[in-house]
Amino acid sequence: MPPGPWESCFWVGGLILWLSVGSSGDAPPTPQPKCADFQSANLFEGTDLKVQFLLFVPSNPSCGQLVEGSSDLQNSGFNATLGTKLIIHGFRVLGTKPSWIDTFIRTLLRATNANVIAVDWIYGSTGVYFSAVKNVIKLSLEISLFLNKLLVLGVSESSIHIIGVSLGAHVGGMVGQLFGGQLGQITGLDPAGPEYTRASVEERLDAGDALFVEAIHTDTDNLGIRIPVGHVDYFVNGGQDQPGCPTFFYAGYSYLICDHMRAVHLYISALENSCPLMAFPCASYKAFLAGRCLDCFNPFLLSCPRIGLVEQGGVKIEPLPKEVKVYLLTTSSAPYCMHHSLVEFHLKELRNKDTNIEVTFLSSNITSSSKITIPKQQRYGKGIIAHATPQCQINQVKFKFQSSNRVWKKDRTTIIGKFCTALLPVNDREKMVCLPEPVNLQASVTVSCDLKIACV
């Protein structure tokens, strides 16, 4: 029986559809990678180590691909010709995913074209801190085995950059030891202090663990390590009591963790912003604030180190020095950047007692202050003042000669002097900018002067 007209139309239509679509030569759609996430544990089941490696690539920064073996890596978006960033978190009290990790990964992938691998060891880092410490060696071995798989794929040791947070910084150090210190870089974000301050260099992060090791210290009086552990060690705001963090224990968890986690947020901010988080070598924080360390000539030959992805932190000398303490001041919130200026006051006449002068920079309702102390029988004193706006945008400077007024007797002492300032690093004192006229100060009286500095 011949086909009816409707059947003929059906077959003809199907043939046309096949010719226009099925035979067009288009490849089937590329399957999307399966996205994985961090594990979650609790206080009772989080002590046994269980490691996941999650790969994030520039084309899909929000999707973590679970990569365990070589076949997983070959079938993923991993690119052996790019650099590899390995993020290792630290101790997790409650067994939860780090709140900062997603932002960190996305920011890192925006800042650089690289493979980013997050090491999830929630199982093994939860519960009791000392149990997590015991898992460090085993975790380091597992990470080393994983990195060996990358080397088989053609990755070079020097292209691997480990970023370790708190306890994760010492894990990174141990991994670096297993590779003979030939990994490219290790960044320790406030490396953990408990159990590590008195540990040997084989047991903790150390300058010998990679070609370049840096550490950012923000909580040296509590959860962070207080000793230098890298080639360059940034002691931010002296390494403790970060601005904007609670200073009293009644703030609870925030009091415990705010200073410690500031290193993470500083690093993320350094990746996001163009303003430099530049630091200056000095023997101590006190000496830095007193204006005794004005450049980076010793030991960096003028190349001041900076937080972020700049190669070797911007340090260009070889061989690299070790355990160099560098200091910087920050604001209380992102982007945290501060400019540092030297301020000097030269007395016209010597005095038989110390002279304390408060100096304040003003710009667009933003103020920054510092104190200059001139020792008795000395001509001048100096200090460091940090300001969020560029120096050339500061339009006024205020002075207050601080004196010990008594209730029954007002101090009417007057001093005269010359004020000068310069932006750090001060490599040439001829670049100092001085007020054109001497400053007359009476005890406890505020004096304002216009400040004009050209923008370069």
UniProtKB/Swiss-Prot annotation:
Disulfide bonds join 245-258, 282-293, 296-304. GO terms for cellular component: acrosomal membrane; extracellular region; extracellular space. InterPro entries: AB_hydrolase_fold, Lipase, Lipase_LIPH, Lipase_N, TAG_lipase. Residues 1-25 form the signal peptide. PROSITE patterns: LIPASE_SER (PS00120). The active site is at 166 (nucleophile), 190 (charge relay system), 260 (charge relay system). This is Phospholipase A1 member A.
